[in-house]
Swiss-Prot record:
Keyword Translocase in record: yes
Species for this entry: Desulfitobacterium hafniense (strain Y51)
Catalytic activity: a quinone + NADH + 5 H(+)(in) = a quinol + NAD(+) + 4 H(+)(out)
Gene: nuoB
One Pfam family, short name: Oxidored_q6
Protein's membrane topology: Peripheral membrane protein
GO biological process: aerobic respiration; electron transport coupled proton transport
A GO cellular component annotation in the UniProt record: plasma membrane
Name of the protein: NADH-quinone oxidoreductase subunit B
Family: Belongs to the complex I 20 kDa subunit family.
Function comment: NDH-1 shuttles electrons from NADH, via FMN and iron-sulfur (Fe-S) centers, to quinones in the respiratory chain. The immediate electron acceptor for the enzyme in this species is believed to be a menaquinone. Couples the redox reaction to proton translocation (for every two electrons transferred, four hydrogen ions are translocated across the cytoplasmic membrane), and thus conserves the redox energy in a proton gradient.
């Protein structure tokens, strides 16, 4: 081992014995952001009912720190788009996204929000909200269960805590 590297490690160990933690500010901020999402709901169809069920006592989303659903996009950092998005609704979706402060993330909940679902061939439907806003996490299902929303939020938490890693965790690992 290099002498300079060994000296650096000894200094770090000495600081740790004095209860001094060395890390970058970005890691601390990302940890805080990942454990305290404030989602704004954009419920458009049946997926919104499952999103409301995720806030209920059976799923208990509050144990992860996500129970504070915001009515105003100016106080939120995660937008959950749940359900079908029509072409007439697209400008409103973009306006709400633009009102959110940085950093901000988007979750597309359900088949309709992700790829149009069974209405993909309709003239009035968008084939995915990623054509309007950048989507960070896709939750499949029609409609997805509340547990899937919790899993999607945990995937987003992992993505926020580890911005250098592109790959998300597999279920159960």
């Amino acid at each position: 081992m290099d002498v300079a590297k060994e000296k650096e490690l000894r200094e770090a160990e000495a600081l740790m014995e004095k209860n001094v933690l060395l890390t970058s500010i970005d890691k601390v901020l990302n940890w805080g952001r990942g454990h305290s999402f404030w989602p704004v709901t954009f419920g458009l169809a049946c997926c919104a009912i499952e999103m409301m069920a995720a806030g209920g006592p059976r799923v208990d989303i509050s144990r992860f720190g996500y129970e504070v659903f915001r009515a105003s996009p100016r106080h939120a950092d995660v937008m959950i788009v749940a359900g079908t998005c029509t072409r007439k609704m697209a400008p409103l979706l973009r306006m709400i996204y633009d009102q959110m402060p940085e950093p901000k993330w988007v979750i597309a909940m359900g088949s309709c929000a992700s790829a149009g679902g069974p209405f993909a061939d309709s003239y009035s439907m968008l084939t995915g909200v990623d054509k309007i806003v950048p989507v960070d996490v896709y939750i499949p299902g029609c409609p997805p269960r509340p547990e899937s929303l919790v899993y999607g939020l945990l995937q987003l938490q992992h993505k926020v805590n580890h911005p250098d890693k592109v790959r998300l965790l597999k279920h159960g690992k």
